[in-house]
UniProtKB/Swiss-Prot annotation:
Protein encoded by which gene: PLC8
Main localisation: membrane
GO cellular component entries: plasma membrane
The species this protein was found in: Arabidopsis thaliana (Mouse-ear cress)
Cofactor(s) named in the record: Ca(2+)
CDD domains membership: C2_PLC_like, PI-PLCc_plant
Alphabetized SUPFAM superfamilies for the sequence: C2 domain (Calcium/lipid-binding domain, CaLB), PLC-like phosphodiesterases
SMART domains associated with the record: C2, PLCXc, PLCYc
Function: The production of the second messenger molecules diacylglycerol (DAG) and inositol 1,4,5-trisphosphate (IP3) is mediated by activated phosphatidylinositol-specific phospholipase C enzymes.
Designated name of the protein: Phosphoinositide phospholipase C 8
Amino acid sequence: MLVTRRWESHPANSPDLILQFFGNEFHGYGDDMPETLRRLTELLGYEKEEDGAGMNAAKKIAAELNRRKDDIPAFRRLRCLELDQLNEFLFSTKLNPPIGDQVHHDMHAPLSHYFIHTSLNSYFTGNVFGKYSILPIIEALEQGVRVVELDLWPDGRGSICVRPSWNFEKPLKLQECLDSIKEHAFTKCTYPLIITFKDGLKPELQSKATQMIQQTFNHMVYHHDPHSLEVFPSPQQLRNKILISRRPPKELLYANDDDGKVGVRNGVEIRQHPADPNYQSLVSFHVVEPRGMLQNVLTGKANKIQRPGWYETDIISFTQKRFLRTRPQRKLLIYAPYKPQRAWMHGAQLIALSRKEEKEKLWLMQGMFRANGGCGYVKKPDFLLNAGPSGVFYPTVNPVVVKILKVKIYMGDGWIVDFKKRIGRLSKPDLYVRISIAGVPHDENIMKTTVKNNEWTPTWGEEFTFPLTYPDLALISFEVYDYEVSTADAFCGQTCLPVSELIEGIRAVPLYDERGKACSSTMLLTRFKWS
């Protein structure tokens, strides 16, 4: 439901009163006030106190800045703060971010209790027809990815190369991939890195791969019986460790294609050659991959979820102790549409997604793993880890709204710096914001602001209300577009954030480009409020 507040004068508030308050708290004169701060005071001046804005919001802003002054190096030595510092604080995505940047989840639980940032086709520079390189692997590791995937094949000269089963480009050498992984594995964080090998190697080449892995990583490789029923160690216990995973051998349990039940399929050969014992001993991390109806449900291919069955309830019990990996289904060489939130709400830990395709799904993946300081491990909500009074959590039965999130878009800035070459060539842009919630089906929603014509620094002052049944699984996305009459609207930045980590109050929300690279200046000044 879209709620747009009209600007109404209110006896207790006015832009002049708030401007005067800021002038008393921070040195400076109204004539010297930065334009962006002046626009905000105008918006606050016409808001009612019961909305949590107006003078109340101004006082909270002043109190927070004064409280944090000594923590900001640029402000620490200043005797008194001026309006310029207030403006810098409010509109800085680093000083006034929407979510925290520190690891704060409990990292001592078993590894199966976490969603893990997973990549698909980690060495692809583009789609399946693109070139292969170590640079995408390095980029992924520097952005907090904790699972990388390598396809191992004979190179025809007695050694091992990295390429898909089909090969359109020059393959990579396994050793250069291993060296790059070792160098960058723990630059973003020190929690364990999982390397998944999909191989078509004969035993003699598996033995050679074992030697290369051991010589490269040495004591960093964690050894654990993948078939052990013991609880897997925690991320904290596995810091600076490398875990080796392999596509499941035929003896491993996985979902049957026909009826979606868990069973043992001995009739299908997943590997063509027996594994070298030393190579197999490196594998410490086995993952189940769903098939058939279960895969359709977890990847969002099913049109609707039917009554609770194994694939909706028992799968959540299964993922409390064991690992489940999902990936988009491929038709020929193109991946089918994919909904990662469907897999998350069933407890699947490893949701593999190509970083070069399906940009909207990539944004969701990046948003999920901005949680917990961006370390690549996000602890599952308690309702996915423990059976409640009515049994195992089932996400589409009897939803009850537990929280209401109110989001107010005040204004935005920075497009003239980051997007001037793409928009506004003939006139100033006509910008609007698309706000959406991704999560369990009952929580998903899409809303839009009005279009602000001919503005590089648009001011909206519009509020939106989102009732949420499972906020711990919800992601909020902001997408900005330049409205066009006769052509597709031009992309002007996006971000996705975990709802559970939003900091209440007026925050500077940073925007990113289509591949998730941070824009240098573009941001949205937004207020988050829970009720």
